[in-house]
Design a protein with these regions (language model features):
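Short, polar/acidic, helix-capping and beta-turn segments at strand->helix junctions
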Residues: 2-4, 8, 13-137
Length: 137
């Protein structure tokens, strides 16, 4: 057990909160849209689906990046609350297309980010974005 670390809080002392929003597409499997633990919110990967219909939005990486990022806002936070993202792309040669849209959502102090090329994504999406946000105090 990690008892000698300054600021350590035992896991059982943190309340786990399940976030679910009709403004974001429902989960495609047995997972939550987002989970809050302490001041952090962990968003499941967002593929570019329209919330009302569950249909894939856009045919290119730019359109799909925009929709995936719009889906992240459904928890009632601003993009300034996002501290880390992971972007999954099916074609890393489209990295610049994703970056051009991504930069419009985070014009100042963008979050830390990793980008990973994958062989496929649900529903034939070209991009998926997961995020970690911090609740405003």
């Amino acid at each position: 057990m990690l008892t000698g670390i300054s600021g350590y809080v035992p896991l059982n002392a943190l309340m786990k909160t399940v976030f679910s929003s009709p403004d974001a597409p429902p989960a495609l499997g047995p997972y939550s849209q987002a989970i809050g633990a302490g001041p952090l919110i962990f968003f499941s990967g967002q593929v570019p689906l329209e919330a009302a219909t569950g249909e894939l939005v856009g045919q290119d990486v730019a359109e799909q990046t925009k929709q995936a990022l719009l889906n992240l806002k459904s928890a009632g936070l601003s993009y300034a609350n996002i501290i880390k993202t992971t972007v999954f792309l099916t074609d890393l040669s489209r990295f610049a297309d994703m970056n051009a849209v991504y930069a419009t959502f985070f014009p100042e102090a963008p979050p830390a980010r990793s980008t990973i090329e994958v062989s496929g994504l649900p529903r034939g999406a070209k991009v998926e974005i997961e995020a970690i946000a911090i609740k405003p105090s």
